[in-house]
Amino acid sequence: MSVIQLVFRLLCVLDLLLAVSASGLHGRNRTLSHEYCVLGAGPAGLQMGYFLSRSQRDYIILERNAGPGSFFNIYPRHRKLISINKIYTGRRNKEFNLRHDWNSLLSDRPDLLFQRISRKLYPSADDFPHYLSLFEKELGLKVKYGTDVGRIKASDFNGHQGYVLTDQNGVNYQCRVLLVSTGLWVPQEVDFRGSDLVEGYESIPTDPEEFKDQAVLILGKGNSAFETAQSILGRASRIHLYSPSPVRLAWQTHYVGDLRAVNNELLDTYQLKSLDGLVEGRLEDIAIVRRAKDRGKRRAAKKRNSTSTKRNEPLYLTLTELLDDQNDTNISNVTGQNLPGYHTDNFSLRQPYDRVIRCLGFRFNFSIFDGSARPPQSSGARGRLPGVTAWYEGRGTPNMFVLGIAAHSRDYRMSAGGFIHGFRYTVRAVHKILEQRYHNIAWPTTNIPISQLQSWILRRVNEASGTYQMFGVLGDIILLQGSHCEYLEEFPLQALPQLSALSGRSISDHGLLVLVMQYGLNHTDTLGPGRAESEWTKAWKSNFLHPVLYYYKTLPTDKDMRQRPVGWPLPRPEAVHHMVEDFLTEWDQPISHSQPLRRFLEHCLKTDLRAFYAESCFLLSLTSRNPPLFCRQGYLRKQGIMGNRHLWQHAREAGLMEDAALSEDASVPEYLNHAGAAVISTVNFDL
């Protein structure tokens, strides 16, 4: 090889190295621009990605881990989901079945349901990331994995406030709209003396043998606390749960975030006096300490696998006010006089513990937001969540929307917004708001003749899954327009004063109706006698989930919303109608459900909404200058079901029509053949 060739090759290598170096430096400072940035590829992020993809918007989903739903790779620690996967409902209606499918995301693919992955009623947590991966790949969503966003700041985006997200490689992502779907993953902690001796739910061993013959104190009384207790129930010598509030049972409160029956076995051993128990007290007032005389000692009956001597030293719960020096950080020099048992000899938690475990849930990660983009902490949920508006936009952070469990502050302890079967619908609602605000595409509506409104409402209360799961939070809005109405599905109720701006739909002088699913306000024994109301004349006393209709002549204002009665989802209306609760959740009976609903609608609309057979419409059209609305909007427009031998035979056998209605040759009268016979139900409303 000549010297010239050698020099030439060296120059080529040097040029290549310089190019790679320049590319790397350039990559650290490059900026990628998108209309929408979705932060987090969990269920809420992928759900929004689906809607953005279907609308053909410019978006990117940024995920710090290597796959979707990474939270479920770790939690729940004992790998059993408590979200219902009820496959068999006796129905084939896909919308109805979503009422009892708490794990699937929404899509136009009927085969893309969670039951494709698992058939268990309470599935394994390992199945959920698998389902999310399937959802992402089969729908072709745009997800960029391995992108750990460490800083978010506000910036100008074409004259409007946008956001810049910076990842671990220094790459900037500039977006017009930021959609935060990071979930809750930062462990909730309480600062008290000795908190460093406490183990966290996120790091405890999951092998029950690790707790063999140990006394365990668990801080918290939520599902994670009871899940942990249940896993060691057959191994630990005693388990005590300690928190400020008494345990709340989901089957009493109707809130799925409260203690579920699938996790409550410890209540048996507590109430049947088998060494386990629940105690209430403020966590901020306690201290976890070691007694000086116990230092270096090991109890023979409490040997543990750990080689740490300190871990084997007994731990005591005491009150900060009993310590000699409340500012002393040394929690190992405590004497018997510093323990509650010295002052109250029957103090519930006077015996020592081998382990203290923190199971206090999780909080939102505020640390990645700088001052220009940081949403405020919520007033509820102990500030664990970001504060958002009624349409899920961050307070003080325009064009930043919060999705999923992080937006649960809007319905905390009230509805299912913190869970997949709830926030899949709020994500869809947010997408409709985005379409109106940024693309001038109004909220989808269905134009319905007033004569068909009752039937449409009955269909929704018997099938709709969004209003059923997000009861009291999402509702159907019916904009009355005279002879017809516009029907908006699943609108955020607390945003009702902003309906026109958020939906792009105007309110007429005829007013509006709002359809809501809600529980009763009376707190009754949910398993006791008289727990349910079956008399339709007392429907307003219903305790369990049931439909409620609100009628307003004008759109409620922000002031009306703030001053609404306690426990009401909406302000006081002009008129209200409760459909009596139903054991089967089927509101389709003529006397208890249909007729009272029709009477209420007639009262609000000042219109006769009775349904008539085609023969009656024919006679009324000949004898009246103003036939009923049902006839004008149906029969006189040649609408309805064409009569045939089968329909007429059914009507005769059901006693709806006289035998004379069928001629000897069973042919349909000529005028009915021409117009069509409307067959609406098994009840003749021609009365």
Swiss-Prot record:
Its main location: endoplasmic reticulum. N-glycosylated. One of its GO terms (molecular function) is flavin adenine dinucleotide binding. It is found in: Endoplasmic reticulum lumen. It holds the Pfam family Pyr_redox_3. The keyword Glycoprotein applies. Coiled coil: none annotated. Its cofactor is FAD. Keywords: Endoplasmic reticulum, FAD, Flavoprotein, Glycoprotein, Oxidoreductase, Signal. It comes from the Eukaryota. The keyword Flavoprotein applies. Glycans are attached at residues 29, 305. GO terms for cellular component: endoplasmic reticulum lumen. GO terms for biological process: ERAD pathway. Belongs to the FOXRED2 family. Probable flavoprotein which may function in endoplasmic reticulum associated degradation (ERAD). May bind non-native proteins in the endoplasmic reticulum and target them to the ubiquitination machinery for subsequent degradation. This is FAD-dependent oxidoreductase domain-containing protein 2.
